[in-house]
Amino acid sequence: MPLSYQRFRRLLLLDDEAGPLEEELPRLADEDLNRRVAEDLNLGNLNVSIPWTHKVGNFTGLYSSTVPVFNPHWKPPSFPNIHLHQDIIKKCEQFVGPLTVNEKRRLKLIMPARFYPNFTKYLPLDKGIKPYYPEHLVNHYFQTRHYLHTLWKAGVLYKRVSTHSASFCGSPYSWEQELQHGAESFHQQSSGILSRPPVGSSLQSKHQQSRLGLQSQQGHLARRQQGRSWSIRARVHPTARRPFGVEPSGSGHNANLASKSASCLYQSPVRTAAYPAVSTSENHSSSGHALELHNLPPNSARSQSERPVFPCWWLQFRDSKPCSDYYLSHIVNLLEDWGPCAEHGEHHIRIPRTPARVTGGVFLVDKNPHNTAESRLVVDFSQFSRGNYRVSWPKFAVPNLQSLTNLLSSNLSWLSLDVSAAFYHLPLHPAAMPHLLVGSSGLSRYVARLSSNSRIINHQHGILQNLHDSCSRNLYVSLLLLYKTFGWKLHLYSHPIILGFRKIPMGVGLSPFLLAQFTSAICSVVRRAFPHCLAFSYMDDVVLGAKSVQHLESLFTAVTNFLLSLGIHLNPNKTKRWGYSLNFMGYVIGCWGSLPQDHIIHKIKECFRKLPVHRPIDWKVCQRIVGLLGFAAPFTQCGYPALMPLYACIQSKQAFTFSPTYKAFLCKQYLNLYPVAEQRPGLCQVFADATPTGWGLVMGHQRMRGTFLAPLPIHTAELLAACFARSRSGANILGTDNSVVLSRKYTSFP
């Protein structure tokens, strides 16, 4: 007998008119049930020709693109000088005693973090800064460059100096100093690594390159650096086959040379390539000339001595003849000293071979929907999550609602800590740098996009004409406004640059995993140090709980001092005291249980207010509606099953038409939300088990068994056995050996 909606409803409400459960419940396994219930609910025929609705309230669906809003007054970010202490394990052991194996393993994962993708695709520098705001190209370019420069100054990025060297600011780690060690003997190295392959050759195997961070960088291969200057070696012709390791004598003279060429006043416009910190840098063929094409002749294979030297693009405007009212020399003449063409880092290290390319584009967006005054950098390293070579990121546990409630539902007083720039605490090994490159090709290449009459630089036609091609009202006005903000840095930011990540970036799937491991290990240490309190974390959200407010304040002081001693930066302005109701992960958790936060309840009410009936809604919009309603489903009487018709339409990528009955049913469900209570520990006395053809129960000394009319999928059979046990015994705790039943997420079975 088919199961009608009325019978289905009676069954849900355990009505007296319903037949015995053993006969009624197996009918729920009938595949046709959804269709019949849909018919009874007047959901109507889904295959109708009415055009689909692609927007419901704030939810947008297919074929809709949100136009990003550029804010020319975004506040530039400021990052503290974050340096997580390398001896973090030792410091934790001083604080709490010996660490557990689990804690040690997690902390070793991030000291340093390693990233070795199977395959890396390199993109041209023009794709470094994405043209995300076509109307504000120049403004966005400088804002992004400033953001990247700020990250480099804060020690988050390396700057590529040449194919095998990089500079950075901040305190070095030991694995970076190992690379930096210089003049001592090579006694640790095998002979295979001692003799370097010549400039321009690619004899090193792929394996050696990828393991450079672990193997060849551990010896004393890079040169020792004296007084922050990078010693300069004469460029070798590729056919000379001379190994890398030969140092010129007289490092003092070289240091002097470097510092001279670093000041880029117009009086000494000696610039050879994109990284003009050194006038004759090693391996130039792959480091610089690809960056500023107009500065070098086509025959770039010639030796350095033959190569003509051109002044820097920005300073060339100074004494040249004006071509119009918008000639850039009017801006360049505003300042006598435009500062250096490139800034130098405090430390230099040797890195694996890094091409003059990027592996991901960057752009700026609002920090979050509620904070449009500040900007956030978006880094697109999605190449590592796509295609045949995609990296399968490690999975990690996310606490579910019930376990959160069991753990945090108590009479404790709560506060939450905010870790500032949490991702940028965790250091990356330099061997990962060639895979995580961002940067830009310089302003001159960007200008080419702006003016339609500009040509890509042709050296036969002289440089001056090309300069005039750059002049346009749009560029002139933009630079004049930006001059007020950035001053002399306009010159610095107009040069090309390539930067690699020194700390874990946000755009890689590995980063959330590493951050979760790190904060959970730290909280584990804090819990053992203060056994009478509770510390819990999810990503960068750390909460502390204690019996009284006074107790909580002293705990807060002790934990803050401990975290600061490890080098973890907290944002004191964002520390929140919650009293006895903790706001965490979208829930409000108190001694009574958990409920969704008010802003989510408000969103649900708004969603129902704007939900149309008798109109086919695009499945993408349905997906967003289900995302919102699914979050609050555990707090409703019916739970997830109420959303099953929506799930089915999303899976089949069909439009869904809400009937007034179904909308009213959902409204009623979500109008009254019930708290999810903490599970009290108790004794289990009722057990259920099943096979595809039969079921069995044990209740104390009583046993029951039965068979199904037809063989069922095992998870369905186990679930039915658990339902029989609950209806027969009324017990709150059931024993089952099936993980699907235990998970209690019945929206889809394996």
UniProtKB/Swiss-Prot annotation:
It catalyses: DNA(n) + a 2'-deoxyribonucleoside 5'-triphosphate = DNA(n+1) + diphosphate; Endonucleolytic cleavage to 5'-phosphomonoester. Residues 1-177 are annotated as: Terminal protein domain (TP). Residues 210-220 have a biased composition (Low complexity). Residues 186-229, 279-302 are annotated as: Disordered. InterPro entries: DNA/RNA_pol_sf, DNApol_viral_C, DNApol_viral_N, Rev_trsase/Diguanyl_cyclase, RT_dom, Viral_Replic_Matur_Polypro. The keyword Ribonucleoprotein does not apply. Residues 336-679 are annotated as: Polymerase/reverse transcriptase domain (RT). Changing D737V: 80% loss of polymerase activity. Signal peptide: none annotated. Mg(2+) binds at D418, D540, D541. Residues 279-288 have a biased composition (Polar residues). PROSITE patterns: RT_POL. Residues 178-335 are annotated as: Spacer. GO terms for molecular function: DNA binding; DNA-directed DNA polymerase activity; metal ion binding; RNA-directed DNA polymerase activity; RNA-DNA hybrid ribonuclease activity. One of its GO terms (biological process) is DNA replication. Keywords: DNA replication, DNA-binding, DNA-directed DNA polymerase, Endonuclease, Hydrolase, Magnesium, Metal-binding, Multifunctional enzyme, Nuclease, Nucleotidyltransferase, RNA-directed DNA polymerase, Transferase. Its EC number is 2.7.7.7, 2.7.7.49, 3.1.26.4. Pfam families: DNA_pol_viral_C, DNA_pol_viral_N, RVT_1. The keyword Cytoplasm does not apply. Residues 680-750 are annotated as: RnaseH domain (RH). Activated by host HSP70 and HSP40 in vitro to be able to bind the epsilon loop of the pgRNA. Because deletion of the RNase H region renders the protein partly chaperone-independent, the chaperones may be needed indirectly to relieve occlusion of the RNA-binding site by this domain. Inhibited by several reverse-transcriptase inhibitors: Lamivudine, Adefovir and Entecavir. Belongs to the hepadnaviridae P protein family. Terminal protein domain (TP) is hepadnavirus-specific. Spacer domain is highly variable and separates the TP and RT domains. Polymerase/reverse-transcriptase domain (RT) and ribonuclease H domain (RH) are similar to retrovirus reverse transcriptase/RNase H. Hepadnaviral virions contain probably just one P protein molecule per particle. This is Protein P. It comes from Hepatitis B virus genotype D subtype adw (isolate United Kingdom/adyw/1979) (HBV-D).
